[in-house]
Amino acid sequence: MEKWRRRIRSGIVRSSRIPWLRFAYRKACQLATWEVGRRLANLPGVEAVYTRHSHPSFVTFAPGQSDLDLTLVLDDAAAQGATAVHACTDRLDALSRVICFVWPQDLRIVSRRELAQIEARPGAAEILSAPSGWIRIGGRDARRAGELPALESGGIFLHPEFNSWWRNVLQSHVMAPQTNLAPESMRLCFRVAMKSELHLQAGRGRLTLAAQTYLPDSDAAALFADDPKMAGLLGRLERNDFFAHDAEARKARILDRSIARAGEFYRDLPIPADAGWIVPTASRSAWLPEAHRSELRARLESAEALRAIAETIIIYPTPHWSPREYQIDLILHDGVAAEAFNDAVSSIKRTLGGRTFGIQGTYAQLTMISRSAFAHPYYLLGTPFPFLHEHLATFAETLFGPAPRIPSPPPSAERLRWCARYFLFHRFTQHYRPRYVSKDCNFCQLAAVRLYLEHGEVLTDAAQIRRAYLDAFVTQAEESRALDLLLRGGDAHPEEIAFAAALQLQSRAYEAVEALLRREGILS
C-alpha cells in the first residue's frame, strides 16, 4: 500500500507542472475533502470537522504534497468514552487508505470543553494557530462567536514547536530526502524554510500576529528581505513550479542558511540575568555501551567532511523514549563555508546512510545546531522535550571536540509557565490517540510532567519514569499493561490491550496534570 501511495504522489507532483492537470487535481482534492468532512461528521458524537492550515480551494495547495491537517470536535459526553473516539480513528484510517492526502498522524481530536480552552489561549496548543483560522468542512460550527483573545505572542520562542521546522523537519528532509517526492522538487524544502523563518520573525516581534490558516508562497520575499543569500536560493522557484536542476545542492544550502538564521536569532535574543551554565565531565558515560561508542566514533571519524564543520559532537539517549535510541548533536563552528556544509550533508548521506541510521540493533539521529543557539538558555525550551536541561547535564557525552556549555534549568516559576503551555500543546496532539507513536509527543513526557508537578521529581529516562509512575499512580493489572502500551515498554502487545483501557489511563493523566496546573494558578 505505501509503495503504491508513494508512486501515486510522485506521479502527481511531476504531472502537476501541466497547468490543466494541476487544476484538475485540485478540483478532485476539493471533492475528496468534502467527502472526508461528510463521512467524519456523520459519526456519533462528532460536532464539527475542520482543516487547520490548508484547503484544496487555495491556489497554493500543491496536489501530491499538501495534506489535510484535520481536527475533529466531539461533544463532551462522547469524549468521555472510547467508543466514539475509536470510531473516529478507525474511520480516518480507512479514509487514508483511499485518499492519499489524508494522514492519520495529522489528525487532532478535541472535546467541546477543550476547544474552549484552546480558544481562550490561541497559539498555545499549536504555535501561531488558533481555532478562529480553521476551515470547517463538516458538521456545525463548534467555535464561540464574538471577540476572542489575540494570538499568544509573548515568549513565543518558549513554545515547544518553535524550533521544529529547522531543527527536525528540514534536517530530516535534506539529509534523508522523502522517497514519495520527485528528487528535483523543491516545494517541501521551500515551505519548511518559510515556516521556520516565520517562527523566527515572530520571535523577534517583527510580525503582526494573526491566526495562520495558510502561509502564501508569495510571502517568501518579505520574510527574507534582509537575507539576500536565502532570497537568492528561493528566488524563481515559484515561477519554475518549484523544480530545480541543482535541487540536492540547493536544499543543503537552504538548510545551512536556516540553521544560521536560527543561530542569529539566539545570538540576538537577550540572555536572562539569572542564567547559568555547566560543563559536563569528560569521562565516559556508563549508560553508553562501549561497542556502540566505538562504532559511532569509527563512523564519525570516517565522515571527515562532517567533522570538519563540527566544533563539538555530543551524544545522549533520546529523552522519554523506549527502547533506548541515541541523539547526536553536532554543534557547528561559526561561519562554516557553504561548500564545506554541502560536503558534510553529502557525507551524512553517503557514510551514515542519512540523518537517522542503525547502530547495532538500535538507532541514532543526528541534528546540526549552531553554537549560539545551543548555548542559549531558551533554546532547549523551544523544543518538545520536558527537562531537557537536566537530561543533557546527566547523560551528554562528548564524542569529538571540547565539552560544550549546557544551560542550567530555568527557575521553577518559568518552568511552571512552560509546563502550562506544553500541556495544551501535548493534549491537543496526543490525548485521544493512545496508540500514536512519536518521539516529539508521547505519554512518557506527560507522565514525567505529572511526576514533577505532583512529587517534584525530574525524570527523563523511560525506564525510571515507568517505575515511578507505576508505584505512584497505577493500582490494577490492566492499568499496568495499558501503561506499558503507552510507554512502549515491557512486553506490551497493542492487539492484546483494549483501546479503552489505554485511553482511560491517558485521560486520567491529562486530568491530573490539568488539576495540578490549576492548583498552581497558571492554568485557568
Predicted feature descriptions by range:
Residues 2-31, 82, 86-192, 263-298, ...:
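Conserved NTP/Mg2+-binding pocket subregion across the NTase superfamily
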